[in-house]
Amino acid sequence: MDNYEFSELLKTLKNKVGNIASIIKPENIQTRLKEIEELENSPSFWSDVKQAGVIGKEKTKITNLLKNYENAFNALNDASELFDLANSENDTETLEALFNDAPKLEDTITSLEISMLLSGENDGKNAIVSIHPGAGGTESNDWASILYRMYLRFCEREGFKVETLDFQEGEEAGLKDVSFLVKGENAYGYLKAENGIHRLVRTSPFDSAGRRHTSFSSVMVSPELDDDIEIEIEEKDIRIDYYRASGAGGQHVNKTESAVRITHFPTGIVVQCQNDRSQHKNKATAFKMLKSRLYELELMKQQDSANTGEKSEIGWGHQIRSYVLFPYQQVKDNRSGEAFSQVDNILDGDIKKMIEGVLISLKAE
């Protein structure tokens, strides 16, 4: 990097921070934080626990947003002032240090962008994720299990907690179906970018001739709904099936019909849950999953309407990403256009940067 490139980078980053400031309005956030502080000092504030919880979440979210903005603004100002000073004194050592720190400065601004992009109504919620293999039997089942492991590793890296809601093993390998709840700050905000069809190209370990195979799996992500969001489901629109749980569970397995499957006729959505020994609890969880999926479907419809009839790029039916393991190694996201060669790292859950690239590119559109 040289002086010209660094000065151009500073211009670009200042422009970004200026645009973000015009959207988030830091002065309005400060005013709102003062209002919340006054509310919290009122004796009656804590009598409504539910409302206090809602305001508490808002406070955490906007405090983090303001903190990220101030960090980015200060880091950029400091770098700009130091650059001018080092230039005027021809201080090559300081200039070299600034050039070396440029990626870190860009990361600080990206952090601000992401925190702005994850300030939507549902982004802070937990996420319900379901993975379904496409046609192709064992090969697709194996691909679904690779994706499942990728998300589990991602959750580990981010400190998210995972609770399995439903797991059905494949007959020879992999899995037929899995649903799990991801708990953590902005779990849905990040994972919503994974909604869609994931394509794998590789030489199949299940093909003795070693031919190249293409497999597909769909990933569906919806926000876990708070109890105060009401979704009406009519009895005539659903069918509830009870069946015996499969998979791990010791002697309890296959003895009682504790697993629950709900089919929603108008949309064709099917959800199932077998993570608890209690049929009653599994039924309650399955209804929660169905409500979340219906809510997500409604969000997509609204997004499509807002896009003047164009299809949203975050959707269950879109092919969003290709993972090519043969004849070359590359993961390419269809929405951001970014390609990555560190395939092993990505399949080991190192997907945060890739997801952030998607969120930024979708916002830019």
Curated annotation (Swiss-Prot):
PTM annotation, UniProt: Methylated by PrmC. Methylation increases the termination efficiency of RF2.
Entry keyword annotation includes Zinc: no
Gene3D superfamilies for the chain: 3.30.160.20, 3.30.70.1660, Release factor
Predominant location: cytoplasm
GO MF annotation: an example: translation release factor activity, codon specific
InterPro entries tied to this protein: PCRF (IPR005139), Pep_chain_release_fac_I (IPR000352), Pep_chain_release_fac_I_sf (IPR045853), PrfB (IPR004374)
PROSITE patterns for the chain: RF_PROK_I
Gene Ontology CC terms, in alphabetical order: cytoplasm
Origin: domain of life: Bacteria
Keyword Cytoplasm attributed: yes
Location of this chain's protein in the cell: Cytoplasm
Keyword terms of this UniProt record: Cytoplasm, Methylation, Protein biosynthesis
SMART domains to which the protein is assigned, alphabetical: PCRF
PTM-bearing positions, type N5-methylglutamine: Q251
Family: Belongs to the prokaryotic/mitochondrial release factor family.
Function: Peptide chain release factor 2 directs the termination of translation in response to the peptide chain termination codons UGA and UAA.
Name by which UniProt lists this protein: Peptide chain release factor 2
Naturally occurring in which organism (per UniProt): Campylobacter jejuni (strain RM1221)
